[in-house]
Amino acid sequence: RQLSVFMGNDYLVTIHQGDLKPLVDMINVCRENTDPQRRQRLMGRSASFLLHEIIDVLVDDMLHTVRKILGNLDDIEDIVFDDTRSAARQISFLRREITTLRRIVHSLKRIVLETGKNLQRFSRTEEDLTLYFDDVIDHVDKVIETLDESKETMEIYKDTDFMLSTEKANKILAVL
């Protein structure tokens, strides 16, 4: 998933590849006017405020993804300690997902920090969006922290799975 943004004083253009359902949902609310209050909140202010709202909804979506990862970690823990099942495949898939998301989130943090420095160019003079973007950075930091912890946990599960598999193989070889 990739999102490109172009903005000026009175406009914001987004182009995205892949499935960015939260962004599509936000656009549909504005286009179809299904929630007039939300539409006014999104469209009635500056381009910088709209950019904040877009980034915020995407970061919130990442928080949902992180919660799913934590649930998958719990499932993998059960599999690692189950003698009848192998966890190698699930560990590999989840490690890849965590690594990919970490790369995305670290890039997003740099972009949000840089954007926060240049906000006033695209805001109305009475608008101070610093607190809004600081709040987004706090959420991004929470995602990063959780992903870092998840990565460490995955490494522990990987090592444990390897040790238990090796021990099981050694027992089988000892019997033979």
Which residues fall in each region the model found?
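Hydrophobic alpha-helical transmembrane segments and their immediately adjacent juxtamembrane loops
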Residues: 138-176
